[in-house]
């Protein structure tokens, strides 16, 4: 079969010496499988994109294939007819390949008659553009229908080729073997323009029909049009390939119009972003990590003070700006680039606290494989569209040392430690760099803890978070600011954004006061709003500096509180049949109960929000502190409302009424016990040191606040209130100390080497000698002491956790106090056991000290913890036996301590007289588990106030059986 090929070169004279040479960059592309092959073509006919510097004799390819080559010179300068030598001169080709069917015998078309009846068919297209690489191709696949069908033109408009480095333009048309039935093919190229070039050669038309072929029917003409294709990217070679594949049946009209296809260089797109001076990023600071890899190696960041000769990857030039001061990747809508590292949208790369936008949008040039897509030399395939870079899930990841993971299909960038994308985005959304400002380092970390709790994330420690901050906002400096003795580290050059909610949170911290109804039930876990004029004359500075207030970080500490606990109901006020004071009516009694209930609920709310300083404000508000100070400012609206509900005169009268005093005492015990359980729900659970310190500072100031707020209130009410508040403060101090000891001992109990050393030292202790010395005071049975000794050693050897040790101690208390359960002597028996436990443990520590045991420090810490925890257990057992709260039990001892004067010399004589009347007391006591110990009398276990040195009696003796 005959195949005709026409070569038209507008630049050089024809030479018929050599066959066409395929360049090294020829792209072999077999015809589509759907095209039927004639008998003469046994193998698929490859297509070659050739560079024709001089015309050669035409070789006849098999089948009815036509090849049209049109060369458009970029300048009128004549070209050399010699064989092309390797040169950097770039060329641009437009290659059109048309697969058509055989021509009928009745439809012969001569070679000289380029005009024929055209039948245009649908053309599914795909364009892949590579910028600044080796080539840029425009691939258009046209499906030629077997039968003449509807018209589906292809129009590619406004593609211009600049003059830069494009001396010649070739138009190559290849027509492979025809199918069974097809039409004539006509190629029309209109206005192939050159930008800034010599006179245009347009239009260039190559409407060449196929020649006569024996036994082959003629075909109708299929016309493809290319109109004014503009290209504004400086490239080495630009090629357009139009390939037509036959289809079996004619389809409906399919029209695809691509106008204004302009590949944009990265510099031209990102140039609109502002430029910020930042250190360079060198290639040794960037690693390429395959997608899906979870481990990233980190190396030291290079110092910005030393000038490295290595060329930086990203340079700050006027035409290329990769940095943005405080923006995000979302601010750049659809930037186009040829070097993408992921296929799932924009990839922010954080350098010096600003993202480098390196993204490719699929909506700019196409969205599917059947549409026009922007490709690139970043790894995108010729069949993938839209992503440009590596298509699919094989996206890589760039890691800046000490920074974040960039890219990957999941669009995640994580710190080399444990930073989540939400944390990085949170930092960028809430903080910004600025000159002349600073932010406390502790405040920033507290904000981070708040963020972690909201996002259900595991926070890192302060040191790791500091590295995270410096990686996001590079170049930060640290300064120690503040007065002498109260200075703190600050990040200099960092501030909270004006749009950040953290700024409003800090403002609320600086203006802590109640707004509106101070006694109404406030919603839990909400920051208390500020009010105009700080209440009760307490300045903002005094509230924020005098006490460690962590109200701004309330939410990250909520996990350590039991905020779900509500205030129990108070009992009704029992008048006990007494007559109301003069001037007080039943309405005043009811108003006092309602107001006091609201007052206690408000205290619970501020405590749950860790706004400890507001407790003093609430006390002053309820007890009308301002109304008793004539020199103070006019009373606030809240005082006016409270005055309407319960006048201050009636409040003073009720403060002397005994039933009101008893009811107030009961309410305070219930309130303070609930507050203890809210603040410290588990004494062994780790609590942040900041929260512990805030609680201790609050306990230290509690009594002075109350005394100051209740000025001019009757002394009877003041004593009741101070006793309960003192017990509450003492409980908070003890529980925080116990918690601190528990965390210190936890580390010891988890250290295998220390446990082994403690066992070795404990085995050297002469427990027989210890028992002999302690029995004179404790009078404990030998078998009980031996059992406790063995249990202690076994538990220590098993390396049990702190919680297991606590369970063992609780079991010891239960076994020892079991015989006294339900008896009236249970409280004194429990106190006696606590004294014996403490004394016996001190004897063991004494022996370890004398032997210079290596583990003395560990034993001392363990002993302190166990003694304190025993105190905690006994306190709760006694309160349970009495049916009261632990706060109420401790309040009784507080009242007893204030009523006794240990320095009174007259009491010594009375105590000496009492010693002489105690000879009839029995001799022995044994608090053994399961023993036949009788119940203790109410007064039998009272120790003598003074014991003679020569008296051989035990300090504690057993009481006679009660009848």
UniProtKB/Swiss-Prot annotation:
Lineage, broadest ranks: Eukaryota, Metazoa, Chordata, Craniata, Vertebrata
Compositionally biased spans, kind Polar residues: 107-119, 181-196, 204-214
GO cellular component: nucleoplasm; nucleus
Residue ranges, annotated region (Disordered): 1-88, 105-126, 174-218, 361-392, 899-948
Signal peptide residues on this chain, from the entry's feature table: none
Keyword Nucleus: yes
DNA-binding region: 423-498
Record keywords, A-Z: Activator, DNA-binding, Nucleus, Phosphoprotein, Transcription, Transcription regulation
Biased amino acid composition, Pro residues: 20-41, 75-87
Chain segments annotated as coiled-coil in the UniProt record: none
Composition skew (Gly residues), residue ranges: 373-392
One Pfam family per UniProt: BCD_RFX
Descriptive protein name: MHC class II regulatory factor RFX1
